[in-house]
Amino acid sequence: MSAPVGEFFFTQLEKVIFGPGKIETLGKELERRGLKRAVIVTGKTLGKSKLLDRVTGAMGARCAAAYKGAAQHVPSATVRELTAEMKRVDADSVISFGGGSPIDTAKVAAASILTNRDATSGARGIDFAGAVKGGDGRELIHIAVPTTLSAGEYTPAGGVTDESTLIKGGVVDPRLQPRTIINDPALSLETPDWLWVATGMRALDHAVEAIYSIRHQMLTDTLAAKAIALLIEHLPASIKTKGEQSLDHRGHCQMAAWFSIFGGMNTRFGVSHAMGHQIGPKWDVPHGVTSCITMPHVMRFMADIAPQRFGPIAEGLGVKFDMGNARAAALECADRVQTFIAQFDVPHTLKDAGVKRNEIPEIAEPVHSEIEHAKVVDRPVNREEIIALLEAAYQ
């Protein structure tokens, strides 16, 4: 046994506030930071809800404007609209409220403002490795108030879709990381069950792919294994129970989402994520749903490549793991995850999600490009293998 060697990159996240009723701390958080002109970003559904009134009420006079046009997969046009609104009120901060779409919309718009250029035009369809360039060094504080489990609020990377090609790219910069995250499970009670579950599967996918990444670390393995265990225990109960019980389970799911992606900029994510990044915008499939579809197949693929790294996954799933029979245990983990997904009313195949089989080869190249740039798989993954995995996930 040798001593651990490496390095760990921390983001600029400063505070995570969690628990029922904690949205009421938002005003004090803005005051503490001296922020007076915050723009809140959300989608059309939450934009019509009383929950938005609760959030803006907590902000008080510090709410300068509300943008309610965030949309799935972050179309570049919505980013430009938000950027214009933030410039109009000379925003000093942005509050994202909802799931991954408003969170990423806020990040990419912030990138446009901080760099004095349209950040959507330079987004790259890879692993978000290209840092945002330029700007005058100023800050634009982002506070995230998530209502799903996609966990994008824990990274400084934001995805955006080019509407002309339906290819998703992204931007990354330490300044894009939300500085404060407020996890109030009460705000998730109106999240549709299918969306809550699907984003929970996205968190599960984060944890699984962090563990078998070649960039995995002891810290990320430990937290990812705990995330898996928490999701297995609490995700089903979170939608089957009501009232205080549901809040308890939802709060544990929010902790799982946090743990699943802790250190994600160190581990990065692999084949399932790369597929999801392109399946989503191409066929308008929510990213949580893409994880429901691709994760078990990619786990079986990785069982042949890196079975020795499935130990923490097995721990989280309650599967007996023996290094002498690692591949069999890894395959059992994949089966266990597929069975777990099957209990929920979400699409389980690409066919169920409305994907056109004859179009599958069209995304092989951008998926391959992301995998190659991420460099988290032990060996190269070729286009034929990508297409074979997508075909397996079709039905």
Tell me the role of every PLM-derived stretch.
Residues M1-S93, L350-K351:
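ATP/NTP phosphate-donor binding region
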Residues L52-V55, L82-T83, P102-N116, T155-P156:
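Short Gly/Thr/Asp-enriched flexible loops that form oxyanion-binding sites at enzyme active sites
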Residues E24, T115-M218, G311-P312, G316:
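A glycine/threonine-rich phosphate-anchoring loop and its flanking beta-alpha core
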Residues K320-Q395:
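C-terminal charged capping/lid subdomain of soluble metabolic enzymes
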Residues A210-R336:
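Active-site segments that bind and position negatively charged phosphate/pyrophosphate groups
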Residues I23-L26, K48-L51, S76, S101-K107, ...:
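Short glycine/serine/threonine-rich phosphate/pyrophosphate-binding segments
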